[in-house]
Amino acid sequence: MNPQELKSILSHGLLSFPVTDFNAQGDFNQAGYIKRLEWLAPYGASALFAAGGTGEFFSLAASEYSQVIKTAVDTCAKSVPILAGVGGSTRQAIEYAQEAERLGAKGLLLLPHYLTEASQDGVAAHVEAVCKSVNIGVVVYNRNVCRLNADLLEKLAERCPNLIGYKDGLGDIELMVSIRRRLGDRFSYLGGLPTAEVYAAAYKALGVPVYSSAVFNFIPKTAMDFYHAIARDDHATVGKLIDDFFLPYLDIRNRKAGYAVSIVKAGAKIAGYDAGPVRTPLTDLTAEEYEMLAALMDKMGPQ
């Protein structure tokens, strides 16, 4: 799949990022991961991101990363395109990127770099180096320390033909508008704030109708129903699902830092697809929070 074909795929539909399965000892559980992918693939997501942020990329050893990406690519070869998360230092990100390309990933999601502080010129150089190390398409994730503006993204677009996507995890509307207006159809644009459904209608109004869904991991039917309601401007259905599920869900998620991942793994367990514990420094939900989420999911009915 060439980068432009990937860009076309990412410009439509719902995206998601499977959690990574670990066993009780905290090791990668390949059988569980295969079962998860086989469950999720038929629901209709346009693409899946393996070893992304919710897939705990930053907790994976290099050998585990290869296992996760190969398992995802092999399992979903005939059903849904797999993009691989990559990140870390520039040299590490390049190694991961080249490994993902070798294993058959259709594209890459370039996660924020490892530094706590860096100039955006330096961030742009990091992105350029990773893009130029591979031939497959790359989506850059503006989040946390990565805050590329329209000027830098325009330069990167000129230098890196395979940089085909921009995922926004900042929620800076002024920045999003400036990027969308400046770059036009050069990129596919993805909403990437945690629990993106809450912001989906607003982002669609900005010209960003595509987003990645965390809750697709455990209520895939509801996630697709919500996406279709957004697509057809069914404000009544959107509002009801936000009131009945997403706002109470946020109340649980916001209790502790890192719960954006932990709550998804808890949801997967409740749904019957236990992915095991999160790895430190993340922490799992408490028993009380787990029961609160279970009650909330029960209201959404069979998936």
Curated annotation (Swiss-Prot):
Pfam family, one: DHDPS
Keywords associated with the record: Lyase
A Gene Ontology molecular function term of the record: 4-hydroxy-tetrahydrodipicolinate synthase activity
Phosphoprotein among keywords: no
GO terms (BP aspect): D-glucarate catabolic process
Matches recorded under SUPFAM superfamilies: Aldolase
Keyword Transport: no
Superkingdom of the organism of origin: Bacteria
HAMAP family according to UniProt: KDGDH (MF_00694)
Protein family according to the UniProt entry: Belongs to the DapA family.
The name this protein goes by in its record: Probable 5-dehydro-4-deoxyglucarate dehydratase
Biological source species: Pseudomonas putida (strain W619)
Classification lineage: Bacteria, Pseudomonadati, Pseudomonadota, Gammaproteobacteria, Pseudomonadales
